[in-house]
């Protein structure tokens, strides 16, 4: 008996030291998708009409920036895109405004209504870009402006008493105008697109395409695409943002055939075969802006407005703005930029020493 007692005590002591095995946490079940045949109409498809009605009531913002050296018809093209005088031509500037010594940013807002839908359009012009003897880093004020709009939106978003609808001044689309030299891109072109394509949706266009023959235009487009590829520059729509095979197929065709769009702009109408058409009069005849045999303006218009406008806005918000937002919040410890929750500047948090074991 006495020999068995210590063994019993040892067993008890060991059982006290060994913890009971913990039950495994419950694994959440994955939702199972089952294709059910509806027994009748429930009205799911009316969500599209609901969204349409809401958009018609509130309207939507669209902010487009035009960049390129003077004389490439930037304002004319934008006016042609929206069939209204939404961009101020250089010829209407004061004498002092004609040759800015540095790159300036000029934003003009308009409200355009079509079919009951209101678009709050802002056209951002960049006079002075590429017009100086030394154009080094002339893209910096443009990048600064774009980031300032992200910052403005971020401050509104993290505000405790934020507005129900935050005014959106973020640049959704940047049309970059390439001079129709027919040779190659300038170092400035490459430098601009390399930096700005990381923060905004850049769409390259060849300006005044009527100055080139069809063969010259085709060769120049291929050369531009090749130079952008060699320099690792991705323009909108970027391959990595294609959501599915349908998107990829559609966007591949745009990337490989249409880009950069070779365009001609005009806000003047002429009579051609009994029809009034937008065009440019030349000694050889009328260049019809919306005729695909003459230029690719119609492709650009359809791309920017009719097929990809919503995607331009979504990529701006979900990719470019989100990248900026994550970096700013990460740099600031997850708090609003430079401020605490009550709008006061927070002092640095001292490191808490680890408690020493006694």
Swiss-Prot record:
| PTM per Swiss-Prot/TrEMBL | Phosphorylated by PKG on serine residues. Phosphorylated by PKG on Ser-91.
Question: Per the annotation, which location comes first and is thus the protein's main one?
Answer: cytoplasm
User: Could you tell me which Gene3D superfamilies the record lists for this protein?
Assistant: P-loop containing nucleotide triphosphate hydrolases (3.40.50.300)
Organ and tissue specificity: Brain-specific, with highest expression in the hippocampal CA3 region (at protein level).
PROSITE patterns documented for this protein: G_SEPTIN (PS51719)
Q: Where found in the cell?
A: Cytoplasm; Cytoplasm, Cytoskeleton; Synapse
Query: What UniProt keywords apply to this chain's record, in alphabetical order?
Result: Cytoplasm, Cytoskeleton, GTP-binding, Nucleotide-binding, Phosphoprotein, Synapse
Record bears the keyword Nucleotide-binding: yes
Domain Septin-type G, residue spans: 58-331
The record's region (Disordered) falls at 1-29
Renumbered residue ranges of the record's region G3 motif: 125-128
The Gene Ontology CC terms held by the record are:
cell division site; microtubule cytoskeleton; presynapse; presynaptic membrane; septin complex; septin ring
Q: Where is this region: G4 motif?
A: 207-210
Provide the residue positions that the database annotates as binding GTP: 68-75, 102, 208-216, 265, 280
Task: Name positions with the PTM Phosphoserine.
Answer: 91
Which residue ranges have biased composition labelled Basic and acidic residues? 1-10
Q: Which GO terms describe its biological process?
A: cytoskeleton-dependent cytokinesis; protein catabolic process at presynapse; protein localization
Q: Which InterPro entries does the UniProt record give?
A: G_SEPTIN_dom (IPR030379), P-loop_NTPase (IPR027417), Septin (IPR016491), Septin3 (IPR008114)
Region G1 motif: which residues?
Answer: 68-75
Give the family from UniProt. Answer: Belongs to the TRAFAC class TrmE-Era-EngA-EngB-Septin-like GTPase superfamily. Septin GTPase family.
Indicate what this protein is called per its UniProt record: Neuronal-specific septin-3
- Species per Swiss-Prot/TrEMBL record: Rattus norvegicus (Rat)
What gene, per UniProt, encodes this protein?
Septin3
